[in-house]
Swiss-Prot record:
This is Histone H2B type 1-O. The keyword Nucleotide-binding does not apply. There is a cross-link at residues 6, 21 (Glycyl lysine isopeptide (Lys-Gly) (interchain with G-Cter in SUMO2)). It comes from the Eukaryota. The nucleosome is a histone octamer containing two molecules each of H2A, H2B, H3 and H4 assembled in one H3-H4 heterotetramer and two H2A-H2B heterodimers. The octamer wraps approximately 147 bp of DNA.
């Protein structure tokens, strides 16, 4: 049995080698599927609010699930509203109404004001 003191040192935490594409038997490279998430955006917002605070991968997974869930709820409600009004397009008005219906009180007010600010910034940058 090899002596644990003489074995190769364990790699430092955070130092991961670049993952290369998997090789098939016929020599062709297989493309790895991309996993989309909101993690970079959650991280950017976290750093704006609390610059000295980090987030674990488990917490990031929970935040990603939360954002996906809220997105689906708002999109579904906005779709329903457009259908009720015999419209085929979801506009910012449907999104705003969906947010007002889904989110409680003060949270809805803040979400609507932030959304309006984002739409104004986007239209002025065009």
């Amino acid at each position: 049995m090899p002596d644990p003191a003489k074995s190769a040192p364990a790699p430092k935490k955070g130092s991961k080698k670049a993952v290369t594409k998997a090789q098939k038997k016929d020599g062709k490279k297989r493309k790895r599927s991309r996993k989309e998430s909101y993690s970079i955006y959650v991280y950017k917002v976290l750093k704006q609010v609390h610059p000295d605070t980090g987030i674990s991968s488990k917490a990031m997974g929970i935040m990603n699930s939360f954002v996906n869930d809220i997105f689906e709820r708002i999109a579904g409600e906005a779709s329903r509203l457009a259908h009720y009004n015999k419209r085929s397009t979801i506009t910012s008005r449907e999104i705003q109404t969906a947010v007002r219906l889904l989110l409680p009180g003060e949270l809805a007010k803040h979400a609507v004001s932030e959304g309006t600010k984002a739409v104004t910034k986007y239209t002025s940058s065009k």
